[in-house]
Design a protein with these regions (language model features):
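Amphipathic alpha-helical assembly/interaction segments
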Residues: 1-127
Length: 127
């Protein structure tokens, strides 16, 4: 039987890396102090899900509409970094876990920035 459906585009490395980072966060979230799990932990969780959602949606958008969605993803990433730092400063996350997550987040940031920059070079500015 011949399939007439086009396969979905392969997932960009940024999405795969974000999924891996979210898996790390998910394990940390379960051990998050109960007093802060649904406030600070919930905020970080929401930003992570927003990051994943915006990267995923960006895959399927036409090039001219990807850039605004990537800007949102980058701002979600910045929010994760900010609230994770607050969690670490308040001893909700160990140094090792914070360091590991931070390394992943920095790499995701470089990937998203490169993706955005590449699109800006290819996409003509709107008239």
């Amino acid at each position: 039987m011949v399939s007439y459906f086009t396969p979905p585009p392969s997932a960009p490395t940024a999405l795969l890396k974000a999924k891996t980072c979210y898996s790390l966060w998910f394990k940390i979230y379960n051990d998050f102090p109960k007093a802060h799990r649904y406030t600070l932990g919930g905020k970080i969780e929401d930003y992570f899900l927003g990051l994943l959602e915006n990267i995923f949606i960006s895959i399927y958008l036409p090039p001219e509409t990807k850039i605004p969605r990537l800007v949102i993803a980058i701002s979600k990433l910045d929010g994760i970094k900010f609230f994770l730092q607050i969690a670490w400063e308040n001893k909700c996350i160990s140094n090792e876990k914070y360091s590991s997550l931070s390394e992943h987040l920095q790499e995701i940031g470089r990937m998203l920035g490169g993706w955005k920059k590449g699109l800006e070079k290819k996409t003509p500015p709107p008239k």
